Design a protein with these regions (language model features):
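NAD(P)+-binding Rossmann beta1-loop-alpha1 motif at the extreme N-terminus of oxidoreductases
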Residues: 1-67, 92-93, 131
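Rossmann-fold dinucleotide-binding core
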Residues: 5, 99-136
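Short glycine-/acidic-enriched loop or helix-start segments at secondary-structure transitions
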Residues: 14-17, 75-77, 104-107, 131
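Short helix-capping segments at alpha-helix termini
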Residues: 25, 86-90, 113-117
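Fold-independent oxyanion-binding glycine-rich loops
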Residues: 34, 54, 97-98, 122-124
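Alpha-helical structural signal in soluble globular domains
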Residues: 42-45, 80, 84, 107, ...
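Short gly/ser/thr-rich secondary-structure transition/capping motifs
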Residues: 45-51, 75-79, 117-122
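Rossmann-like NAD(P)-binding element
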Residues: 51-105
Length: 136
């Protein structure tokens, strides 16, 4: 089965990572951003769905890549109540690329595990050019 990918957080880094994977033949099915116009524009460009909820992004992908700004944003997308990436997460893989505190990564890993999902820490170094070129 071919992996389907969702991106959560499609600012400059997330959007360029999504573009790169799409250009390389990967199936990017969903994008989500707290600033909806970013997701809408990128979705139109790469042929993905601009999700209105985090749960919808989880539903549409087997691999969910998160590229959010900080601890608060990471905790919000992995909330235990309400709209969350954890809704329907059983069997999914989260790859968390945000640079957040070690405790947040541990907390997210525990929440994912509790939901039947897996979570990997994949912090990045470099910038937008490297994201677009695939050299992070």
């Amino acid at each position: 089965m071919k992996e389907t990918i969702a991106f959560i957080g499609v600012g400059r880094m997330g959007a360029n990572m999504a573009r790169r994977l799409k250009d390389k033949g990967y199936t990017v099915t969903a994008v989500y951003d707290s600033h909806a116009p970013l997701a809408t524009a990128l979705a139109a460009e790469i042929g993905a769905e601009a999700c209105k909820t985090l749960a919808r992004a989880t539903e549409l992908a087997s691999l969910i890549i998160t590229v959010v700004t900080d601890d608060k944003a990471m905790r919000a997308i992995f909330a235990e109540q309400g709209d969350s990436l954890l809704v329907g997460a059983k069997g999914k893989l989260f790859v968390n690329c945000a640079t957040v505190s070690p405790q947040v990564h541990l907390d997210v890993e525990a929440l994912a595990h509790k939901s039947g999902a897996e979570s990997l820490e994949a912090c990045m170094a470099s910038s937008i050019t490297q994201a677009r070129e695939g050299t992070l």
